[in-house]
Regions:
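Viral virion structural and adsorption modules
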Residues: 2-146
């Protein structure tokens, strides 16, 4: 099965559909996005479709193949045509975090430090502080970084 995202005027994913492979292959049996898009346009009347892969997540293909467009989208995600990726705008945890266009994940402006063994033993971990735009070492049971 091939998967295609139905794209709205603001590049928001309206829906994701599965398409039988027979509807998106050429005469040599090679899957082509353009054939799938044409099939969907003719059969739905909607003109904006972008192929996606159910096997791609965070910029990695589960089967070791070439990842397709960052991550498999859901309704409400955004298709970034400049970077050719899908991303979840609602997954952005803090305003200062930026979109990694290789993985389609939101990342902090500075990497999260690794706790030392002593810090972990003391029940400490790093948590993002948006006000200071920095990682802070905090204490507490069951706390975790963002």
């Amino acid at each position: 099965m091939a998967h295609f995202a139905k794209i709205g005027v603001d590049n928001t994913v309206l829906n994701v559909v599965a398409l039988r492979n027979i509807n998106c292959v050429d005469e040599d049996g090679v899957e082509k996005e353009s054939i799938g898009k044409e099939y969907l346009e003719q059969n739905t009347g909607h003109s904006a479709w972008v192929q996606c892969s159910a096997n791609t997540q965070d910029g990695v293909h589960k089967e070791g193949r070439t990842p397709l467009r960052g991550s498999f989208p859901s309704k409400g995600w955004v298709y970034d045509s400049t970077n050719d990726i899908f991303y979840n705008p609602n997954a952005k945890p803090y305003n200062s975090w930026v979109l990694n266009t290789n993985t389609s994940r939101w990342e902090p402006p500075t990497a999260r430090p690794t706790e030392t063994d002593a810090e972990r033993a003391a029940g400490k971990c790093y948590k993002w502080n948006e006000t200071n735009k920095a990682w802070e070492l905090i204490s507490g049971v069951g706390v975790s970084g963002a």
